[in-house]
Amino acid sequence: MATMVALSSFAVVGRSAARSPVVAPRRRTLVVRAQTEVSLHVARTITVSVFGCLPASTITSRLDLTVNLFVYVQPDMDSAKETTSASTSPSPSQYTSPSPTTIPAAPKPVTKKANPSVWDALAFSGPAPERINGRLAMVGFVAALSVEAARGGGLLDQVGMWSSGLAWFLATAGVFSVASLLPLLQGQSVESKSSGIWSADAELWNGRFAMLGLVALAATEFITGAPFVNI
């Protein structure tokens, strides 16, 4: 009977201990429920006498009651939520930094090109020689054909007139050369004066054809011995 009372009291104590709530901190804590192993030893002595004949014998019985209680740890929900939110929150490195605003570079000051000298303009690769020769060739080709048609003399006869022919040639060459050099020495270009069909490229090609025409005219008259207009 005493054993039952002891067990009942132990069970009541254990039940009340199990029902009592464990107050745990709300944030960043772990709820720990720990119980120990309890061993209950109950000794009971029983005196037995069979029919009163045999001497009484004492029987001692021992009741061992072992209660194994386990320890387990339960994480707090708030701390678990904080851990989850901390793991899912973006790191500062994931934020894209705004690209720096590019400041446009200041325009370089336009330096005025120096005017070429006479020797630069009259150089073999300069702008003056081919253009001046082309203009003189165009004027000479038209003048040679006009004189042949008017007087009947060939190109070689016209060059042989040292008094009038050579004077006209030198005067025409001087005027056209000076008129072509002055704009170049002032820094102007022929391309800046081009408009429509009066372009710099057209003038170059016409001058080249005129130079070839003068050479062909002189060669033809020398071979045939007669002016080109009479052939």
Swiss-Prot record:
Residues 1-31 form a transit peptide. One of its GO terms (cellular component) is chloroplast membrane. Residues 83-109 have a biased composition (Low complexity). Its main location: plastid. Residues 81-111 are annotated as: Disordered. It holds the Pfam family Chloroa_b-bind. It is found in: Plastid, Chloroplast membrane. Induction: By light. Keywords: Chloroplast, Membrane, Plastid, Transit peptide, Transmembrane, Transmembrane helix. It is a multi-pass membrane protein. The chain crosses the membrane at residues 165-185, 209-229. Probably involved in the integration of pigments into the mature pigment-protein complexes. Belongs to the ELIP/psbS family. This is High molecular mass early light-inducible protein HV58, chloroplastic.
